[in-house]
Structures are given as C-alpha cells and as structure tokens.
Amino acid sequence: MEDYKQRIKNKLNVVPMEPGCYLMKDRNDQVIYVGKAKKLRNRLRSYFTGAHDAKTTRLVGEIRRFEFIVTSSETESLLLELNLIKQYQPRYNILLKDDKSYPFIKITKEKYPRLLVTRTVKQGTGKYFGPYPNAYSAQETKKLLDRIYPYRKCDKMPDKLCLYYHIGQCLGPCVYDVDLSKYAQMTKEITDFLNGEDKTILKSLEERMLTASESLDFERAKEYRDLIQHIQNLTNKQKIMSSDKTIRDVFGYSVDKGWMCIQVFFIRQGNMIKRDTTMIPLQQTEEEEFYTFIGQFYSLNQHILPKEVHVPRNLDKEMIQSVVDTKIVQPARGPKKDMVDLAAHNAKVSLNNKFELISRDESRTIKAIEELGTQMGIQTPIRIEAFDNSNIQGVDPVSAMVTFVDGKPDKKNYRKYKIKTVKGPDDYKSMREVVRRRYSRVLNEGLPLPDLIIVDGGKGHMNGVIDVLQNELGLDIPVAGLQKNDKHQTSELLYGASAEIVPLKKNSQAFYLLHRIQDEVHRFAITFHRQTRQKTGLKSILDDIDGIGNKRKTLLLRSFGSIKKMKEATLEDFKNIGIPENVAKNLHEQLHK
C-alpha cells in the first residue's frame, strides 16, 4: 500500500513549474479527476499536503498515480482540460453533460418544416428558440402555433392525408403540391413570434376575427378572440428585465466554504425566461473553475450560444473568449452591470440556503457508505450499481439497474433491459445476461466501474454475477445480495464467498441506504415491466383484428396512442386517418365488444 505513496512522492519532485493539465487515476487505472494549473508542481503538491474538505480528502484517498501534460499557456491548458474531461468523464469533475436539459422549440430544416419541442440541440438541423422555463410552457406555445398555422405534423410523410389535414391543421404536403412561398411566409411569422415579435400574429388574428364576425361565424370569431387572449397572457407572464431585446446569457457567482455557486440568467427579448444554478466544490481557484464551467456549458448540445455573454469584470476576458465563440461583455456600470450583480447576489443566496441542507445530506449519505464499506471490509463504495429482475411467469421478462453515487440516486445513469437470451422464468440466467451486457459495454466504452454491485437476491444470484464478472470479463468488483423477509421488506445484506450476513444495525444509516436502493431498483424494474406489458397488450389486441397489419397498427398507435383513445374514436375518425371503411367498421366493433 505504501509503494504507491512513495511513487507519487518521487514523481512530484520531477513535475515542472509550468502550466498544464493533470490526470488523477485510481487503483483500476481509471481517470477520476482532471485539473489544470498555472504551476503544475505547486498544484499537485497541494493535494498531498495539508488538510482538505471531505470531497477532496476522498479524492486524494483514491489516487494511486497521476499523469501530467505541460502546455505553452494557461489558455491552452483550459482547452486541453475541457477535451480531457469530455474524453474521460471523471466522476470527481463537475460533469454537466446530462445533468440538465432545457426545452426548446425547433423549426426543422426540411422542404416542408415541422414544429417540435425538443431538449436536444443538433446544429444544422433547424432553428431553435428558447430555452423555455419548463416543458409545459414550450408545449403550450407549440399548441398555440399549431392552432394558428397549418404546419406539417407527421414525422415521416404518410401515403394518405392524415387527421390533421381534415381538421385544418395541415396543408397536406404529403399529397398536394403546397406553395413553398406560402409555407415560407408561415415560417417567417412563426419565427417572428418566437423571437418576441407578436404584433404580426396578433394583427393577423384580429383580421380573421373581424372577417368571421362579419360573416356571422361567431363561433370561429370567439376562437380567434381566445387565441388573441392566450398570446397576450403568454407574453405578459414573463418578467421584463430590459427594453433591449438582444439574446444574452448573464453569469454571476459566489464562493464560500470551499463551494462555488454559479447562476445563469437566460435573457430573451428583454425577459428573464429561465435561470440555471450550479453548485461546484472548489478543486481549483474560483477563476479557473469558472473558465472550466463556462467552457463545458457551451460545448454541450442543450445550450445555444447567445448573441452576448455577460460576466463579472474580475475574470479574464481572453480566457473566456478562447472557449466561448460569441461576444463577451463585462459591464462596468448601468443596468447591465446591475444584472451581473443580481446574478451574483442570487448565487450567494442559493449558496447560503443550500449549506445546511448539503451539510446534513452529505454527513448522512457519506456516513452511510463509509459504514457500509467498513462493515463489508471493502473500500468506501462511492459508486453503487444495483440490479433487479421483473416478470410474470416468464412473460415479458425485464431487468433494471439503478446507480447511487455518494449514497444518492444518480438517475441519469439508470438503465433498463429487456431479457433477450433467456426463455421462461429463470431469474439466475436473466441476471447473468444483464450483468454481462452492462459491463461488456462499460469496458468497451471506457465508462466508470462501480465500487460495489448489489443484486436483489441471495447466494445463487451473487455466484452467477461473480462468475460472469471474473471468468468472462476479467473484473474484480465486490458483489453483494439483498434479501427480503416474508413481508417483502429489506432484511439482510449478504457478502463474501459463502454469502454471509453483513452485521448491520437496522437503525443504521447504512441499512437505511440499502433499503432505499432496494426499493428504488424494485420500483424502477416494476414500472418498466408494467410499461412493457401495456405495449405488448396493446399490440396483441390489434393483432387479432382482421385488416390491421403492421402499417395500420403503426398508424393507429401514432394517431391515437392508446386503446382507451381508440374506443372513444368514431368510425369517421378511423376513416379520416386512412383506414378503409370495412376495416374501420371491424375495428370499431372489436373495440366495443
């Protein structure tokens, strides 16, 4: 054990006093942290001398060796650091990749564009507007535009006119040669509206309302009036921050007790439409952490570069400009400076509000995993992955995996599996298949390995998993089994070659954590199994109806989504989406038996 400490000590003596990046590695030779420094030797030595906060202490405790790369400048170090973080995705770095996603409205780049709500931005595939405060806000805006403009709705062009054409919400480009100039005009008006210019659309609706009223079509006139009110309500809900309608993001931050909070205000058309809060445990200086953060922030698909980015004046503008390809502004006075100060103040408030909760939560969860590691005689299990199977007499067998990091659920790393190779209700073989698939992929893609694997089951499940890991994949990862009592409650943890009971008190934090893990993986597996059964049941009902093949089945599922909606549909509804009358009658009769 002491050998690695001596190796680290010896290597520290040859690290140069130059700028560069460093990579910390654990006992499995996995990169667990990437950092940068103006002077590599000083920064690296600081990790192995003096006292640290809890997170840094845990990081240092896992380091078995390090590597470093010398660069010619601080800017080059920052760019290299961002690339290394993207490449290795170390667990001790603040990884923003999947943590947050925001809803945008997209106009697709197609001959006949569509209007979509999406959380993924793919450059070159269309125009994006947002982000929106939440999915509901984006969906409501899209629904409003769908009612006003007969834009194409179908993902793929159908062979026949769909329901949207018959209700006046599509021009039918799948069948008719729609005038492209008319479509372009609609696109312009939608774009103007999404950019905050609602006068054109309001004027158009007012003209339609007046025409309908003069034609004594009062029902249609009322519909236009309601749409006008809806638009006015939608635009009035947002807080006006500025009469300047430049699209900009405003950054402010606060630092205290080894933590950094960064707030981002998304300003669109003079309105603050959303804000983002990120907490970062400081591993570098606050300026260095900020440069890394903002570099990651805009290298991800869910963040579109605005026209301007406003940041505090104490930061190096050139460093930010090297990783953010848009106009960087550091306001010195006036409303723009006030906005940066407001973001910083909000960061400070958020930091203060979170401290007590973070402290309480950290102490509880860290104590739980430390206690678990001590009782099992293993290294503190920072990353735990747990598996559970679900099926009814072998029908639609599925499995699920949940991930806990630092004793807390890491939902973006949950996974679902449909059992592919096992016939009938064989829990052991199902568990072997899923573990084989999971960790084959982890090895192939260089993903982080867990410190502990937990299976819902006993010695048989454990032995099967250990056999796959050690004899097929060459992995040595601790495997434990969680068993339940006759009341289906978490009862005991099994570990070791003979699956002995780990002595945990029922009122301990470690036992409570295991209870949470078992409940969570069971919930996740059951929910997935229920969803799978519903889909299977839905398809089987349609399979039994004459005249309904794969194409019509897909059409029905896409148009109605559920058996309940199909039962509520009329014969005309089925005919309107292209179902022949005789098949529609048969379908209608079968659904109402």
Swiss-Prot record:
<dbReference type="InterPro" id="IPR038476">
    <property type="entry name" value="UvrC_RNase_H_dom_sf"/>
</dbReference>
<dbReference type="InterPro" id="IPR001943">
    <property type="entry name" value="UVR_dom"/>
</dbReference>
<dbReference type="InterPro" id="IPR047296">
    <property type="entry name" value="GIY-YIG_UvrC_Cho"/>
</dbReference>
<keyword id="KW-0267">Excision nuclease</keyword>
<feature type="domain" description="UVR">
    <location>
        <begin position="199"/>
        <end position="234"/>
    </location>
</feature>
<comment type="similarity">
    <text>Belongs to the UvrC family.</text>
</comment>
<dbReference type="GO" id="GO:0005737">
    <property type="term" value="C:cytoplasm"/>
</dbReference>
<dbReference type="Pfam" id="PF22920">
    <property type="entry name" value="UvrC_RNaseH"/>
</dbReference>
<keyword id="KW-0234">DNA repair</keyword>
<keyword id="KW-0963">Cytoplasm</keyword>
<dbReference type="InterPro" id="IPR010994">
    <property type="entry name" value="RuvA_2-like"/>
</dbReference>
<dbReference type="GO" id="GO:0009432">
    <property type="term" value="P:SOS response"/>
</dbReference>
<dbReference type="InterPro" id="IPR035901">
    <property type="entry name" value="GIY-YIG_endonuc_sf"/>
</dbReference>
<comment type="function">
    <text>The UvrABC repair system catalyzes the recognition and processing of DNA lesions. UvrC both incises the 5' and 3' sides of the lesion. The N-terminal half is responsible for the 3' incision and the C-terminal half is responsible for the 5' incision.</text>
</comment>
<keyword id="KW-0742">SOS response</keyword>
<dbReference type="Pfam" id="PF01541">
    <property type="entry name" value="GIY-YIG"/>
</dbReference>
<dbReference type="InterPro" id="IPR001162">
    <property type="entry name" value="UvrC_RNase_H_dom"/>
</dbReference>
<dbReference type="GO" id="GO:0006289">
    <property type="term" value="P:nucleotide-excision repair"/>
</dbReference>
<dbReference type="InterPro" id="IPR036876">
    <property type="entry name" value="UVR_dom_sf"/>
</dbReference>
<dbReference type="Pfam" id="PF02151">
    <property type="entry name" value="UVR"/>
</dbReference>
<dbReference type="InterPro" id="IPR050066">
    <property type="entry name" value="UvrABC_protein_C"/>
</dbReference>
<comment type="subunit">
    <text>Interacts with UvrB in an incision complex.</text>
</comment>
<dbReference type="GO" id="GO:0003677">
    <property type="term" value="F:DNA binding"/>
</dbReference>
<dbReference type="InterPro" id="IPR004791">
    <property type="entry name" value="UvrC"/>
</dbReference>
<dbReference type="GO" id="GO:0006974">
    <property type="term" value="P:DNA damage response"/>
</dbReference>
<protein>
    <recommendedName>
        <fullName>UvrABC system protein C</fullName>
    </recommendedName>
</protein>
<dbReference type="Pfam" id="PF08459">
    <property type="entry name" value="UvrC_RNaseH_dom"/>
</dbReference>
<dbReference type="GO" id="GO:0009381">
    <property type="term" value="F:excinuclease ABC activity"/>
</dbReference>
<keyword id="KW-0227">DNA damage</keyword>
<dbReference type="InterPro" id="IPR000305">
    <property type="entry name" value="GIY-YIG_endonuc"/>
</dbReference>
<dbReference type="GO" id="GO:0009380">
    <property type="term" value="C:excinuclease repair complex"/>
</dbReference>
<keyword id="KW-0228">DNA excision</keyword>
<feature type="domain" description="GIY-YIG">
    <location>
        <begin position="17"/>
        <end position="94"/>
    </location>
</feature>
